[in-house]
Amino acid sequence: MENSQIIFNKEKATQSILYVANRLERRDLHKIFKILYFAERKHLQDWGMPILGDTYIAMDAGPVPSRVYDILKIVRGDSYMSDTEGLKKMFAIEDWMYVVPLQDADLNKFSKSDIDALDWSVNTYGALSYDEIKEKSHDIAWRSTAKDFAISWESIAREAGLDSQDIEYITQTLESNKSFA
């Protein structure tokens, strides 16, 4: 299952940032990144598909969703891209690292399974400290990837407990879906 087979959903990404940020007490980038990673892993385990389809980079503090990070850098003002989509109307960044949601997430953008996985992740990991969630995110998928490289979806699927047969089925489904896109 190659990362190129997974299609990133920017609309779900922005709504997921809002959804998670509205449910966390500590809304720093690190916490949001990890909550999204665990939600994607859970959804992959339960449904064979990620929610956002972002590319997770193995960084020092754990997996980082690269496109979500790009979105937040646009809002923060340190991106080479400008805010052409009104992202700053959805959320702000304070003190370089805290996400302030300026509206609620549009729940119509999610399936029930998306919301279930996001809620599971918030409920399971939301109260953890920086060090605790960092340690939990330093899983085999993260450890088996070179620093600053993309963690393969196959590694994430294996970390979620899927076996080779499940991964092969998901790969075939993704290929079929791509031909209809």
Language-model-detected regions and their locations in the chain:
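Domain-edge interaction signal
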Residues: 1-181
